[in-house]
């Protein structure tokens, strides 16, 4: 190859390389500009229109790094649209309940710093479940735990942990409260926290970590609420609150709350005579609650809440196998669906039930006289037929030789249906166990299952002789 040919060849190769590089730079430039503009757009699932991402959301976005030769481009991915929960799916069909969680708080207190608590409950946001309880402002192995049998002191706070995590020293204290309820509307948590003087208490409404509203006592006699989860449908949360006598006529009101703000208050109506400590669940398009009549009945009151027009109705669970404690034996107990049965109505315990067509699932203490043992079963016709007593699918949760306590319901939304779950408070210490000076609890949690299941007993399990005094 002569010198001229060499020059021509080298020139051709150089020109080709330059052209390729030029085209690559154009491609990089086009890609950069395209990604720059697309990072501020997201597709709305509602109408397929392009919506601008709000700048305030960018801090929560996921950042993807895209590498093009030596150029680094950050692409912002628009987050999913956060929506209110509507609970419109059907209730899951179940055959019974399967074990889900147990926190073993009392056993762990023998060798660790665990809060003294009572009135526990469970509630879930769209992605995770949490356990709550009212702390006594002290750990168990602490002299402040003496005489913690008392319900209402200014040091009590609402505690919140992931389900299954005992209330250790690092636990978050959500608010000041000796009575409470919590629920998640799909966007943020609402906490209803009651504290203050018995004759002039205050309920604070905390939404998304901020105090939004409050209400004072309306009957000057221990304003109190559910001690389990409230329910939110399409952004409206309902909570049942009572103020007045615990063994006589009281003033029960249902509060409707939107993002922490009270938007309406409805008085209790219907045939229920006394209502407190309600266990509520979504029954689209409304909310249904099973409560405690501490005055006249050992059959449990039912409160139906219409979220759209704020109307209220109430009656009693029809099952002749009644759910409260104390109660008459099953042969002589009764319920006519409309009125309290006037059988050992004075005193009681928080509990739960839920309808399943014409039937009812329910839980109760095994003992008819004390908070000992715990059982669940289904009563055929127990939702619609007065004094129905045909029991099936009975399960022992805590054997009759061990203590139980309050119990309540919470709901979990699955892919195709809404499951019902419950917790049982396992009380230990005073008054029954006088070797120690404290009163506290652990919990056990079960959820509905469509599968098969075995048998067992899941008591607290702590040896009181090994516990701090």
Swiss-Prot record:
Gene name in the database record: NA
Name of the protein in its database record: Neuraminidase
Family matches, as InterPro entries: Glyco_hydro_34, Sialidase_Influenza_A/B, Sialidase_sf
Pfam families assigned: Neur (PF00064)
Molecular function GO labels: exo-alpha-sialidase activity; metal ion binding
Role, per record: Catalyzes the removal of terminal sialic acid residues from viral and cellular glycoconjugates. Cleaves off the terminal sialic acids on the glycosylated HA during virus budding to facilitate virus release. Additionally helps virus spread through the circulation by further removing sialic acids from the cell surface. These cleavages prevent self-aggregation and ensure the efficient spread of the progeny virus from cell to cell. Otherwise, infection would be limited to one round of replication.
Additional remarks: The influenza A genome consist of 8 RNA segments. Genetic variation of hemagglutinin and/or neuraminidase genes results in the emergence of new influenza strains. The mechanism of variation can be the result of point mutations or the result of genetic reassortment between segments of two different strains.
UniProt: Ca(2+) binding residues: 293, 297, 324
Membrane topology: Single-pass type II membrane protein
Family: Belongs to the glycosyl hydrolase 34 family.
